[in-house]
Amino acid sequence: MKKPARMNAALLAAAWLLAAPCAADAAGPDAETARLIAELGLQESATALADRPGWAPPKTVVIPAADAARLAWMQAAAPGVTLLPAKDRAEAAALATDADAVIGFCTPEVLDAGARLRWIQVLSAGVERCVGIPGFAARGIALSNMQKVAGPVMSEHVLAFLFGLTRGLATYVPLQAQGVWKDDAVPDARMWSIEGKTMLVVGLGGIGTETAKRAHALGMNVIAVRNSGRTGPPYVAEVGLGADLIAFAARADVIVNTLPLTAETKQLFDHVFFDAAKRGALFINVGRGASVVTADLIAALEDGRIGGAGLDVTDPEPLPADHPLWRAPNVLITPHVSASTDLGEEPRWLIARENLRRFAAGGKLLSEVDVGRGY
């Protein structure tokens, strides 16, 4: 079976370079977009935009600036809508005064200027900055994101941390830089075989699901916690609710946080959590840095309650050069790059274009955010 989201970048590029305005563009997604939607399992909103109060066909949409071929490809999805390219946030705010929607920009300035805004498409999975803008929820603006688009590559980043921590790379890579051959630098007890180990995935959305799938394929026993119910895919042995987090943590050799940042998840991983975790467990975070009390994590690493950490996100971020987290034992840190990929931006453009088509037609958006819940 083809690996999710591992599409040929050249084919994706050709999809928009060769596209031309036609009736089919307004009628439904093209084959490449339909395949991407199916592979990622993207969900559409329950209610069509045309069935919501105050609906009227849109006239103007602000989009990120791009070359002429890209703009023509976007325009083909919404022939009756004027597209206004913006090269940065300031230009997007200036253009938003006459816009019905904005793709790629969600800032206080855009919200203040855009009195007519009815839809915003962000080009990331995280929406905490957008929904955190004062008054956003009261505006009733439909918000869609890129949930699941980065799930496959971010789950691979989780595995990179997993292998790095279980094979001593946090110790051996610095020794390599020093030209030191020391085959006993990492005790055998820390050189894990991951087969048969238990992984707890906290948050079973796009990233969590892809992580669970890969961990199961490696022979791990996968358990998970989510808020939406106790059901999950067949490769997850057991699914608990938020109230089960502490009990599940006590059983896990590896804990992976994929949660978005909300009022409920902020500083969720604190000394109480680390005290309850299985001693020596590994902690991997590709969710949000602010979901962790950093001082508590450092303390847990220093006294061995947590055996190591792989962190793509931190609090604060960027992490200052003199921050003690850099020097905590058995830690791998990457600078919020787990979504980076050689696939480029094509999948995001495909989803943005499809949602533009749906918005222009008054249809059901893909990956609409529950603004009240924050994801």
Ranges and model annotations:
Residues A10-A20:
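Bacterial N-terminal signal peptides
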Residues G208-T209:
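N-terminal Rossmann-fold NAD(P) dinucleotide-binding loop
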Residues S155-P174, H216-M220, L350-G363:
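Oxidoreductase and adenylate-handling cofactor-binding alpha/beta cores
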Residues A27-S144, V272:
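An N-terminal-biased, well-structured beta-alpha scaffold segment characteristic
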Residues L204-G205:
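Glycine-rich Rossmann-fold phosphate-binding loop(s) that bind the pyrophosphate
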Residues S228-P324:
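Rossmann-like adenosine-cofactor binding region
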Residues L143, G280, V286-Y375:
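Rossmann-like dinucleotide-binding domain for NAD(H)/NADP(H)
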Residues A138-T198:
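Phosphate-binding beta-alpha-beta segment of Rossmann-like dinucleotide-binding domains, i.e.
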